[in-house]
From Swiss-Prot:
It is a peripheral membrane protein. Residues 488-507 have a biased composition (Low complexity). It is an enzyme of class 3 (hydrolase). It catalyses: GTP + H2O = GDP + phosphate + H(+). GTP binds at residues 138-145, 205-209, 259-262. Residues 129-314 form the tr-type G domain. It is found in: Mitochondrion inner membrane. This is Translation factor GUF1 homolog, mitochondrial. CDD domains: lepA_C.
Amino acid sequence: MKLCGVRSSGVSLTRSSDFPRFRAAHHGGAHTATRHQSLCGRRLDSYMGAGKRWCFRPLLAEPRRYSNASSAFTTDGATAPAHGEGLYVSHYAMPEDARRLVGTPQLLPRNPAEEVAFKKNLIRSFPQACIRNVSVVAHVDHGKTTLSDAMLRFSNLLPADGATGTFTDRLKVEKERGITIKAQTCSVLLTLRETGTQYLVNLIDTPGHVDFQYEVSRSLCASEGAALLVDVRQGVEAQTMAQFYAALEQNLTILPVLTKMDSVMSDAEVEKTLLQLEDSTGLLSREVILTSAKSKRGIEQLFQHIIDKVPPPCGREGFSDMKQLPAMHPGSADRKKVEKELVPLRALLFDCWTSESSGMADGAASAPVSTASSVSSGTAPASGGQSVAKDGIYGLIRVMDGTVTPGTTVTFFHSGKKHEVREVGIIHPTLHPTAALTAGMVGFVFFPGLLKKDVFIGDTLCTLPTRKHTMRVVATGSPATASRTKPATAAETASSDDASGSGSSSVVEPIPGFKTVQPVVFAGFYPDEGVYITQLREAVDLLCVNDPSVTVEQLQCPALGPGLQLGFLGFLHMQVFKERLLMEFGQAVLVTPPQVQYMYVEQHGDPDDPAQRKPVSVSNWRWPHEGVGAYLEPFVTATVLTPSEYLNEINSAALSAFRGEMQEMRVIDGARTLVRYRMPLADLARGFFSTVKSSSHGYATLEYDDLTYMTADLVKMDIVINKAHISALSTICLRHEANTHARRIIGSLKEKLLRSSVDLPLQALVGSKIIARETVKAYRKDVTAKIHAGDISRKQKKWNDQKKGKERMARRSVGTVTLDQSVLAAALGATTAR
């Protein structure tokens, strides 16, 4: 039996109150431990039905001891390993690999004549019973990338002495920051030595930061299992629980894994983490797998648990298009028989990328390189020998039912448009074309000429093999609006497909999409000097193919011109997106604070009628009050789910700093509380999400919905420089916030404006009232530098002449102030990406 990753011949099953006595017995020596082990083995059956509370503890393989360089000891004839001075020998020892599994990488053959045979044999050897789809999830810096690389090296896909992150961290920004941003998939081929059975394990390495939770949710939709990693030194943290609940909602098999076992300095650390994991998740300690990617221990045991415990896919197998079969005479008996056995293709599209935004071309340079004989026209060879087309979109799919092959024409449920698949394959760890992707497999498909507007992450790709097959009509909108319950629901179409032989039409159902996420951080992106808005929009659109969680809206700023307002899942998400624009597309942008759209209704108008609302503009001729009945501000309902101990701090900030109004407070369980606030969208966008995360140390979650408009007291604030109105800096704000905004803008202008030969007065006005004022002092020439003696009146005469000259210059230079883009951006609170 394996307990906590330790092989032992029995189980130590004791009461919680008897645990100190149990520990003392084990410290007594090997004889005592053996006697206690045999005793527990005889009483195991009687204890299981006693109905009492028991604690499972792994048996000691040997008594725990301290060793140093000057003392050597032996236990049961075995010499303890020398770990150096003062190091601790833990009894939570990871077992040696049983060498039952061996990695068998299938690379493209060097002989072009063998390529067709290779593709066919690769697919035929993997029925659904031999496929496992697993996502690797964990908190930030808990060892996901290192463990994923160790698993690939165990499978002989990466060199044993390669650097960490050679596969998972493909993007340049990932390598510079040292974090995982995009979920990466790799198909691993393993052979069981005893039976020769070959397994296809699809590993998905996911990010750990809360800003990239959308990547995790999409990956879980394509999996039947999740490996939940926990750092043995750090224990259970915020994202550990978030990933656990996300996997639980998808009804996935969860494999608990302790990482970084090579860093353990005391068994108390392991026991504390095991107890914490069991108390917070309910996962039994005896099911935890102990691993160390650095020492390459526990990797085979983790693979063995994936094969043994993660259920295989359960889709419907079969061909999905007559083009996938040899030509048959229309109306022949063979063709009719084959048509009855056709299975409509149903595949979930859970990621997309282009050749410019994937990082695939340089992500696995250490992989074995084959010849580029398979590169066709219109494609360019990339590392690993794969063919990467230049024009088009790659889609990462999980095939639920049927088969997709090159040349298959698939239909997108959302748009109803049809597109032909040019190439299919697996990521191993680079793009390797195959003959087909069958039910249960995870792989890529390439669509030449596919546009971004036709791609929706979470959409269902399908085929209609015969005229009897029809698609269920879906409502217009994003296909990912419905919450997914489980990865595969093949039973939805089983009954209708079985009726196809009786003359009734078979309805192909869409796969339930995963829940979309809402942006919580907004920012305006404007092209830097020398960059056109069309170039920026094209780069953003291409990057949004690879990052669908970003929302895009058009903006028009009088100061900076046309721009884009983007919505992100956090500040780190925004910074990474800005860096990717610069690194991958060369687009330097100005990032400004978020803006919200205020509305107004005319006199005698109804504020509750959306048709009567009109957007407020600083150039509106009706401003400030001519013919206006009321000004409106957008409000949302923010829902916060937080551990109860952090509720007071979050509630205080929401009510005092973010103009929130509590609508509901409900205790979910003994540890969590749900609170709903009504607050302005502007306050939520300017930092409420960050406050919630920092106050709860990352454990709380925030969602918002129900956008409505409520009356507000708005004013127009004008900026005057040297008696000239600067229309580009005119803004609309709430009356009680006007003074704060005015001081910030005037202070920024004072710092950024260059001094001239005359004083520049800076003023902020609401109507005709000055609410803030500063002065940029003029340069003064030292006109008395050559006067070294004499009466003081000589210097005063020079100073008076200089003063009169300054006054004449000021009268001639009224209103002649030129502001460049950097000054305007600084006044609006912008930052430049360089």
